[in-house]
From Swiss-Prot:
Gene Ontology biological process terms in this record: carbon fixation; oxaloacetate metabolic process; tricarboxylic acid cycle
InterPro entries: PEP_COase (IPR021135), PEP_COase_bac/pln-type (IPR022805), PEP_COase_Lys_AS (IPR018129), PEPCASE_His_AS (IPR033129), Pyrv/PenolPyrv_kinase-like_dom (IPR015813)
Official protein name in the record: Phosphoenolpyruvate carboxylase
Gene source species: Chromohalobacter salexigens (strain ATCC BAA-138 / DSM 3043 / CIP 106854 / NCIMB 13768 / 1H11)
Gene this chain is encoded by: ppc
EC numbers, comma separated: 4.1.1.31
Length: 883
């Protein structure tokens, strides 16, 4: 590794790599390890502009005997995973997140002082943080490539590194940790990297709960303690006891859009799992508290509650523990399909758990035992405030067309015609009238289709569940007010009094452009306002809009839609919460959370925000307590700053510039992706898209429909496929033409540089584009093409795309006024450079295996098929993202 990288990171990569080498030698012999070293050496020299070494590498890989292909791919895949462990460990130990620009790493203490310096009163700080509502929504897609079995081993390896570093003067402890490390690496090597079956939605939900148990359960009280201390120092006050600036929700088990595996029964099971896991975790907390709170001094209120018991805290906690254990047993019985009988009442609400703990806390403070009150008891109070009785709030997501189908069948059954044939005004009139009507609409014995029955059953599950366990009902592919009214009516018909927030999801370019008009019309309906109250949630889709229109056009449409929504909700005196459906990659709205939030339009955050955390990003951001703590700090910093120190409104000339850039980029993108007849055949030929369906990433199918072109693909495999070949096309196509056009005009360069310097939205976009181009590699993309594409027309298209990428890099460097990419972030550049010699062989092997697979018409041996899947996992690990 480069000598500039931190010594401890270098040492840990070397320790893990050496141990992996010994493990492989024990399994396959020293001769095989020599092959790995030969491949690595050729790849390393090939990265030093040695074209002969690059040629030798390809020849060497193509000449490997079939029996070596799988273990070679596994060796490089595991090394990249171990590099990720070392990097993750480094970040946790030094509490540093490598941002895009030096000096932009958010610091909560510094931010509080900056806010005070801007003239905000100390009380304003406390009130803003206490009222802050940031929900991080854990989702299962683009899913985690690495098996959870291996994740547990990797976490244990990280613990060994921690032990070894902390035992420099205790050789026997360090030696035991080294021995355990060798064992774990051997376990990982002898474990299949690829799942044999796709995880079920319940499996995904269990993984989400495991992240809470293993990481967030500790990180949440740690975060509140830090926030408490900083507020006390800066504002002279502590955070209110029941404040929960950051909470967690989930789509795992609730997101049924395009996933037939998420049924009403699955949703009910996941809700019960959340109740069971929460009760189990609280029971552990209460056992500890019952052991520790042996004091006899108590205030009158607690004495009145427990009587003359000599250990009043234990007496109260004993009762509470019995209820929590009964809740755990009840949930388990429901999951097992068994009856449950107990004379102890179960815990139904957050307050039933919180109130007894608060009584203990107040009593301890009243009798002068504040130090004890602010220990483990306060941690549990904070957990209850954040996690409630279900750990996460479960969102429900369904596509608008499924609700329309319900009313189409229903209107036909009632002799009213076909709902699908009605125009928007007719639909609204019907839905609003039924929302006001006291009589039921759905017949008791209605013989509807299985699809409609499933939708209704889902609403019945929602109706049976306590409101605290549920989050938002998200409507994907929403385009009209009737899409929201339909869900409201289904809640009324099936759910009675239960009303969840309903969030239309605007995810195509046209939908984003119409979002303001839809919400304006919706909020102007008196019947809807009476039902919705003074709040409205709207979800902004990043993945599909970028696939639909190109990244630059989508980013600008998202920005403008948010501006319009802020203005409309302000006019209607409605509190707007924006829900950002971001992924891990640039093409799906990914990037550093702090920069992304601060690049939103002024007024769009205002203390309230929801954002998805997806797949492998959950592990990178929240998989370990220290890193989870840092991630929560970043979100708190960004939302607090965006609320109290919002960015300035963009200047009118900047808007005009973005309108023009967006239009040029959109036309260039559509001209290739939608209008070039060679594009889809090229995409299918040059990427591993067709093989992705066999990679058991998650419970969701890779395609919305089995036939069709790019439009039938979900955004996740669309981006995954291009990432594998290093062309990274979805995140940049069209941008180069837009920027080049402007640079060729008088004053264009100065205007773009000014926008970059003074407009966070534009600056953040360019920063993410720079990172993306640093990971792209046209030479690797060209090799895939040489190996997999025969038709001259397709080869010509590929050459054109690579030339566009090269021109974009030149144009971007001009705007940035730099000689090289990532010139000002050398750590990130070095991290990419260090990984390349381990990723390059996987690209070479993947192209070879794809060609063999096609030659065999998909009938390659199971070993080669597995090797192909391992190359995909390894490249994703090396680039630190999937889709």
């Amino acid at each position: 590794m480069s000598h500039d990288l931190h010594e401890s990171l270098r040492d840990n990569v070397r320790i893990l790599g050496d141990s992996l080498g010994r493990t492989i030698a024990d399994d396959l012999g020293d001769g095989f390890v020599d092959k790995i070293e030969t491949i690595r050496g050729l790849a390393k020299r090939g990265r030093q502009d040695d074209s002969e070494s690059r040629r030798e590498l390809i020849e060497y890989l193509r000449a490997l005997p079939e029996k070596d292909l799988l273990p070679v791919t596994r060796a490089f895949n595991q090394f990249l995973n171990f590099s990720n462990i070392a990097e993750q460990h480094y970040r946790a130990r030094f509490r540093r997140v490598e941002d895009y620009k030096p000096g932009t790493q958010p610091d909560l203490g510094e931010l509080l002082e900056r806010i005070r310096g801007a003239g905000h009163a100390p009380r304003k700080l406390v009130e803003t943080l206490a009222a802050m509502r940031v929900e991080l929504v854990l989702t299962a897609h683009p899913t985690e490539v690495i098996r959870r079995t291996l994740i547990r081993k990797y976490d244990a390896i990280d613990e060994c590194l921690t032990t070894m570093e902390g035992a420099t003067e205790r050789e026997e402890i360090a030696a035991r940790a080294r021995g355990r490390l060798e064992e774990l690496i051997s376990q990982a090597w002898h474990t299949d990297e690829i799942r044999h079956e796709r995880p079920t939605p319940v499996d995904e939900a269990k993984w989400g709960f495991a992240v809470i148990e293993n990481s967030l359960w500790q990180a949440v009280p740690d975060f509140h303690r830090e926030l408490d201390d900083l507020l006390l120092a800066s504002a002279g006050e502590r955070l209110p006891l029941d404040a929960a600036p950051l909470r967690f929700a989930s789509w795992m088990g609730g997101d049924r859009d395009g996933n037939p595996n998420v049924t009403a029964r699955v949703t009910e099971e996941v809700l019960l799992l959340g109740r069971w896991m929460a009760a189990d975790l609280y029971a552990r907390d209460l056992l500890r508290l019952k052991s520790e709170l042996s004091m006899w001094k108590a205030n009158g209120a607690l004495r009145a509650e427990v009587g003359s018991d000599p250990e009043p805290y234990r007496a109260l906690l004993k009762r509470l523990l019995a209820r929590v254990e009964a809740t755990r047993d009840w949930a388990k019985a429901r999951l097992d399909g068994r009856p449950f009988d107990s004379n102890v009442a179960i815990i139904e609400t957050r307050d039933q758990l919180y109130a007894p703990l608060l009584s203990c806390y107040r009593s301890l403070c009243d009798v002068g035992l504040d130090t004890i009150a602010n220990g483990a008891l306060l941690d549990t109070l904070r957990r209850v405030a954040v996690f409630g009785v279900s750990l996460t709030k479960l969102d429900i997501r369904q596509e608008a067309g499924r609700h329309a189908q319900v009313f189409d069948e229903l209107s036909d059954c009632l002799g009213l015609g076909h709902y699908r044939d009605w125009d928007e005004a007719q639909r609204q009139d019907f839905l609003l009238e039924e929302l006001e009507s006291p009589r039921p609409l759905i017949p008791r014995r209605w013989d509807c289709s299985a699809e409609t029955r499933e939708v209704i059953d889902t609403f019945r599950v929602i109706a049976r569940e306590h409101r605290e366990a549920l989050g938002t009902y998200v409507i994907s592919m929403a385009g009209q007010p009737s899409d929201v009214l339909a869900v409201a009516l289904l809640m009324k018909e099936v759910g009675g009094d239960l009303q969840l927030p309903i969030a239309p999801l605007f995810e195509t370019l046209d939908d984003l452009n119409r979002a303001g008009d839809v919400i304006e019309r919706l909020l102007s309906l008196p019947g809807y306002r009476r039902m919705a109250g003074d709040g409205q949630e709207v979800m902004i889709g990043y993945s599909d809009s970028a696939k639909d229109a190109g990244q630059l056009a989508a980013a600008w449409a998202q920005y403008r839609a948010q501006e319009q929504l802020v203005g409309i909700c302000r006019q209607h005196d409605v509190a707007l919460t924006l829900f950002h459906g971001r992924g891990g990659t640039v093409g799906r709205g990914g990037g550093p959370a702090h920069a992304a939030i601060l690049s939103q339009p002024p007024g769009s955050v205002n203390g309230s925000l929801r954002v998805t955390e997806q797949g492998e990003m959950i592990r990178f951001k929240f998989g370990q307590p220290d890193i989870a703590l840092r991630s929560m700090e970043i979100y708190a910093c960004a939302v607090l700053e965006a609320t109290l120190l919002p960015p300035p409104d963009p200047e009118p000339v900047w808007r005009e510039e973005m309108d023009r850039l967006s239009d040029i980029a959109h036309r260039a993108y559509v001209g290739v992706v939608r209008e070039d007849p060679d594009f889809v055949p090229y995409f299918r030929s040059v990427t591993p898209e067709s093989a992705l369906g066999r990679l058991p990433l998650g419970s969701r199918p890779a395609k919305r429909r089995q036939e069709g072109g790019v439009e039938s693909l979900r955004a996740i495999p669309w981006i995954f496929a291009w990432t594998q070949t290093r062309l990274m096309l979805p995140a940049w196509l069209g941008s180069g033409e837009a920027f080049a056009t402007r640079l060729d005009e008088p004053g264009g360069r100065e205007r773009l540089r000014d926008m970059r310097a003074r407009w966070p939205f534009f600056g953040t976009y360019l920063d993410m584009l720079e990172m993306l181009l640093a990971k792209a590699d046209p030479d690797i993309a060209a090799y895939y093409e040489r190996r997999l594409v025969d038709e001259p027309a397709l080869q010509a298209l590929g050459k054109s795309l690579r030339e566009r990428l090269s021109r974009l890099e030149t144009v971007l460097l001009d705007i940035l006024d730099q000689d090289t990419l990532l010139e000002h972030t050398p750590l990130i550049r070095q991290a990419i450079e260090v990984r390349n010699p381990y990723i390059d062989p996987l690209h070479g092997l993947q192209a070879e295996l794809l060609q063999r697979n096609r030659d065999a018409d998909g009938a390659i041996s199971p070993e080669l098929s597995r090797a192909l899947m391992v190359t995909m996992a390894g490249i994703a690990a090396g680039l630190r993202n999937t889709g």
